C-alpha cells in the first residue's frame, strides 16, 4: 500500500476511534516493579506476516529490556504491543489504538512505510515515536516528536560502499533491488549515489518485487555484465534466494546489502551462499563494550541463541525510552519525555554510545560486517 494512502487513512482514523476496537495487544506487566511509577508504553511491531523474522527478534530484545527495567524498579513499563503483520493499514489502526490509550511513548514500527503512515498521527497527538529498524530517508522530517535508534541509509549505505570499495577495490558493480518496496527503492537510490561518489561504474540495474521467487532472468543479465561486485537491496526472504541463485550461476562476487540483510534468516535460506555478503550496522556482537558483552551474555542465557541487529535495536529502544522518562522525572507527560529523549547524550547502549542529533537520528559508530561460515563478523578496514 502506498504510504500517501496510509496518511489519508490515518487522518480519517483520528475521527473514528471505533476502528481501533478490533485490535488486540499483549500486556507487558511484570513482577518485581518495586515502587517505580507506571509508564503506559506502546510497541508497534510485526510478529507475523512477511516481516515476522525481524519482528520476533525485536520482541525478544524488547521483552528482555522491559523485564530488566521493571526489575530495577525506578520505572514500571506497562507495555501494549500491537502486531501490524507488516501491513500499513494495520499500522495505522495500531497507532489509533495506542493514541486513544494515551501512551506516554510508543516504540516502533518496524517498517519504514509504516512509520511514514503513522508518524503524522503521533506528531499530531504529541506522543514521541521511537522507530526501531526504520532507516528510510525523510522519516524525521515528519516532526519533532519523531525519533529512531537505527542509523539512516544516508549514513549507513555510503559507509558500506566506502569501506568495501577500499577493502575490495571493485570498479564495476551491478545493482538488483525491490521496486515495489519503498524502503528498498530508497536504499537503491542511496546506493547509486554512493557508488557514483566513489567513482564506481554501475554496469547493470535490475529489479524484482517482494515475494518473487524466480530471479533467473535478472541474474543472467547481471552475470553477462561481468561485475566485480553486486548490490542487493531487499529483505531476507528474497535476498536469500537471490544469493543461492547467484552461486548456482557461478557468480562468486561479493554482495553488498542494506539493513534488510541483517537477519540470521538470510543465512538460513541461503546457506553457504550467504558467505561474502557485506553490510554495515551499528550492532556487532564483537563490539568492545561492557554493555554489549552483558547484553549478548544475558540474551544467550535467556533465549539459547545469539541476538541479531533487530533484537539489539529493540532492546536499546526500550532502554532509551526508560532513560528518557527517568531523566524527565515523569511517566505520564509525553512532552517532557520527548524533550528528555531529544537531549540524551552518550547513552551507553548495547549497540554503542548513542546521542540523538537535532533531527531525531542517532549518532553512533557503524561496524562493517561480513558473513563468514554463516556468522556476521566484524571487518577492520
Region spans (language model):
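Short, low-complexity disordered leader/linker segments with a strong preference
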Residues: 1-40, 71-72, 381
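Beta-alpha junction/loop-to-helix N-cap segments that form part of ligand/metal-binding clefts
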Residues: 29-33, 54-60, 72-140, 208-212
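Extracytoplasmic "Venus flytrap"
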Residues: 42-61, 82-88, 111-112, 176-185, ...
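Hydrophobic alpha-helical segments within soluble ligand-binding/sensing domains
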Residues: 91, 149-172, 185-187, 214-216, ...
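Periplasmic-binding protein-like
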Residues: 98-110, 130-132, 174-177, 226-236, ...
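An alpha-beta-alpha
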Residues: 146-207, 229, 321, 325
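Extracellular/periplasmic periplasmic-binding protein-like sensory domains
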Residues: 243-315, 376
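Segments of small-molecule ligand-sensing domains
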Residues: 301-311, 322-375
Amino acid at each position: 500500500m502506498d504510504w500517501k494512502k496510509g496518511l489519508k487513512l490515518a487522518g480519517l482514523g483520528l475521527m473514528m476511534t471505533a476502528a481501533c476496537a478490533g485490535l488486540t495487544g499483549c500486556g507487558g506487566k511484570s513482577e518485581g516493579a518495586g515502587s517505580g511509577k507506571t509508564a503506559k508504553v506502546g510497541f508497534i511491531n510485526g510478529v507475523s506476516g512477511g516481516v515476522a523474522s525481524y519482528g520476533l527478534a525485536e520482541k525478544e530484545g524488547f521483552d528482555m529490556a522491559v523485564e530488566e527495567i521493571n526489575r530495577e524498579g525506578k520505572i514500571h513499563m506497562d507495555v501494549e504491543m500491537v502486531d501490524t503483520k507488516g501491513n500499513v493499514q494495520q499500522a495505522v489502526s495500531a497507532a489509533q489504538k495506542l493514541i486513544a490509550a494515551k501512551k506516554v511513548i510508543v516504540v516502533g514500527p518496524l517498517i519504514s512505510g509504516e512509520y511514514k503512515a503513522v508518524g503524522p498521527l503521533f506528531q499530531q497527538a504529541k506522543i514521541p515515536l521511537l522507530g526501531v529498524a526504520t532507516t528510510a530517508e525523510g522519516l524525521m522530517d515528519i516532526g519533532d516528536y519523531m525519533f529512531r535508534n537505527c542509523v539512516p541509509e544516508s549514513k549507513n549505505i555510503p559507509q558500506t560502499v566506502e569501506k568495501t570499495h577500499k577493502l575490495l577495490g571493485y570498479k564495476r558493480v551491478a545493482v538488483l533491488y525491490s521496486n515495489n518496496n519503498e524502503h528498498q527503492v530508497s536504499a537503491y537510490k542511496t546506493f547509486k549515489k554512493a557508488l557514483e561518489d566513489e567513482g564506481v561504474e554501475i554496469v547493470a540495474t535490475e529489479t524484482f518485487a517482494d515475494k518473487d521467487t524466480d530471479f533467473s532472468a535478472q541474474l543472467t543479465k547481471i552475470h553477462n555484465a561481468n561485475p566485480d561486485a553486486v548490490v542487493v537491496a531487499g529483505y531476507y526472504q528474497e535476498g536469500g534466494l537471490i544469493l543461492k541463485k547467484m552461486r548456482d550461476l557461478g557468480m562468486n562476487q561479493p554482495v553488498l546489502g542494506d539493513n534488510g540483510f541483517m537477519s540470521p534468516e538470510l543465512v538460513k535460506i541461503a546457506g553457504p551462499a550467504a558467505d561474502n555478503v557485506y553490510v554495515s550496522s551499528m550492532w556487532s556482537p564483537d563490539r568492545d563494550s561492557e554493555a554489549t558483552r552483558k547484553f549478548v551474555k544475558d540474551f544467550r542465557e535467556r533465549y539459547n541463541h545469539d541476538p541479531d541487529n533487530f533484537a539489539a535495536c529493540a532492546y536499546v529502544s526500550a532502554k532509551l525510552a526508560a532513560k528518557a522518562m527517568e531523566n524527565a522525572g515523569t511517566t505520564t507527560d509525553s512532552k517532557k519525555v520527548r524533550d528528555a529523549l531529544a537531549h540524551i547524550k552518550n547513552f551507553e547502549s548495547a549497540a554503542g554510545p548513542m546521542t540523538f542529533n537535532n533531527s531525531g537520528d542517532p549518532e553512533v559508530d557503524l561496524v562493517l560486517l561480513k558473513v563468514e561460515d554463516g556468522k556476521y563478523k566484524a571487518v577492520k578496514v
